Regions:
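Polybasic, low-complexity RNA-engagement segments
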Residues: 1-45, 288-291, 298-445
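Conserved SAM-binding loop of SAM-dependent methyltransferases across substrates and taxa
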Residues: 109-122
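Class I S-adenosyl-L-methionine
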Residues: 169, 222-225, 230-342
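Helix-to-beta-strand junctions that scaffold the AdoMet/dcAdoMet cofactor pocket
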Residues: 121, 217-219
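Mobile active-site "lid"/loop adjacent to the S-adenosyl-L-methionine
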Residues: 134, 171-211, 228-235, 257, ...
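S-adenosyl-L-methionine
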Residues: 129-167
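Conserved AdoMet
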Residues: 31-88
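Conserved class I S-adenosyl-L-methionine
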Residues: 99-108
Length: 445
């Protein structure tokens, strides 16, 4: 049952189209996944998922919900991210290029951040921020699972970031917290949480977040604002008010045939260009309700230069581990937080004073004069000389993911793989492989 106030508003806005809109709520949910470009070595078969392309996302696919791809070892290895198809649109509109500096300001749980990272292909810097500490941990875990090496995951208030990163980013995504009306079909909580004053409350918060984002974008940079709501107050209304207050921003006109135009006639005193924003309607495409606006800041200046984070010296234990295993590293510089070593992009600015959950690629920790590699490094690695591979259906693979030791004559640190995908570490003593798959991720056989 839709909230009465919501239904009345949508009936008035959509007129004769309201019947089709209402009927879309009885349609089966669209389930989607997005392939991870960073996992190019995959040799397995995904045909059982009955994949069909998502028109607006080259790496996006609809899948048969009964196939349950989230239970496959391929999901654990970061081959794909399960994501609602319409939610794939904002990152495609932002379209970051390898080498750019990109900010995802409201990033949890990580669907759009992992999509942006896939476009950067390990080059440049991606800063992912989430103000909610619990959700920020989920974000960090998803960045790890997909093998992303050039991201800084933060748990900060947007205003604090504005003070640190003025004019620093080439591109910014603001997937703003909203009333969630586009998720009514998918999440019952979105329906029960809705109230008549929800839209205005959300719009005020969205304008504050946009103001913070604007100060971090370089002149000439691109900003995408998106929501998963139908509310004109939170969509065209927010963008219109932002544009009137920030004349150095304008709406970019992009040709995207899959989406419907924004509706300047639904808000008072509309700013120029609202018709070039985008609405995704569940009765017009296979996906949930979304809105997106692509904004450009006037000018053309290089991103601001910030003091770099100083590099740390490589501990001898890490050097010895690499000498023994031949484990590759991405380009970058070494950082140490206590006993833990990270490899981060060279351009990473100073992070002192920020709540950092993840910096680049976690390599591992120096413990009692030895080096123990991190799970994140295993997921980033494409290959290792000392590795063992199992087919997806091999019972030994299920045993590994459950935390069991495995019979093996191998010695030393060993990379466990399936069909060209790395899953984690094990350590052999000549008789068996001791399991180093993280306990929090283990699943019963």
């Amino acid at each position: 049952m839709l909230p009465e106030g919501f239904a009345a508003r949508m009936r008035a806005l959509l007129g004769s189209e309201y019947g089709d809109f209402l009927a879309s709520f009885d349609r089966p949910l669209c389930t989607g996944l997005r392939k991870n470009p960073l996992k190019a070595g995959f040799t397995g078969d995904l045909s059982r998922f009955s994949l069909a392309p998502v028109p607006w996302c080259p790496t996006g696919f609809y899948y048969d919900a009964a196939s349950r791809p989230g239970l496959s070892p391929y999901h654990a290895a970061g081959l794909y991210y399960l994501q609602e198809p319409s939610a794939m649109a904002p990152a495609e509109l932002l379209d970051p290029q390898p080498g750019e500096r990109v900010l995802d300001l409201c990033a949890a749980p990580g669907g759009k951040s992992t999509q942006l990272a896939g476009k950067l292909l390990g080059k440049g810097l991606l800063v992912c921020n989430e103000i909610n500490a619990k959700r920020a941990k989920i974000l960090s875990g998803n960045m790890e699972r997909l093998g992303i090496s050039n991201a800084l995951v933060l748990n900060e208030h947007p205003k604090k970031l504005t003070e640190r990163f003025a004019g620093y980013f080439d591109k910014i995504l603001v997937d703003a917290p909203c009333s969630g009306e586009g998720m009514f079909r998918k999440e019952e909580a979105a329906v029960t949480d809705w109230a008549e004053d929800t839209n205005a409350i959300c719009a005020n918060r969205q304008l504050e977040i946009l103001a913070s984002a604007a100060g971090m974008l370089r002149p000439g940079g691109r900003l995408v604002y998106s929501t998963c709501t139908f509310s004109p107050v939170e969509n065209e209304g927010v963008i219109s008010e932002f544009l009137w207050k920030n004349p150095d921003f304008s709406v970019e006109k992009l040709d995207v045939p899959f989406f419907s135009p924004g509706r300047p006639d639904w808000v008072p005193n509309p700013a120029p260009g609202l018709e070039h924003t985008f609405r995704l309607w569940p009765h017009r495409l296979l996906g949930e309700g979304h809105y997106a606006a692509v904004l450009r800041r006037t000018g053309d200046e290089a991103p601001a230069a910030l003091s770099p984070e100083p590099a740390a010296k490589c501990p001898p234990e890490l050097a010895a581990f690499r000498g023994q295993t031949g484990a590759a590293l991405p380009e970058g510089k070494l950082l140490r937080f206590g006993d833990v070593c990270y490899l981060v992009p060279q351009e990473l600015p100073e992070v002192k004073g920020l709540r950092v959950l993840r910096a680049g690629l976690e390599l591992g920790a120096v413990l009692k004069n030895r080096f123990e590699p991190a799970h994140a490094w295993a997921l980033w690695l494409q290959t290792l000389e000392n590795s063992v591979s199992f087919e997806e259906a091999d019972p030994l693979l299920a045993r590994y993911l459950s935390g069991d030791v495995l019979p093996s004559g191998r010695r030393g640190w060993t990379l466990v793989q399936t069909d060209g995908l790395s899953l984690g570490w094990a350590k052999g003593d000549g008789n068996q492989l001791k399991n180093h798959y993280p306990k929090a991720l283990r699943r019963p056989v």
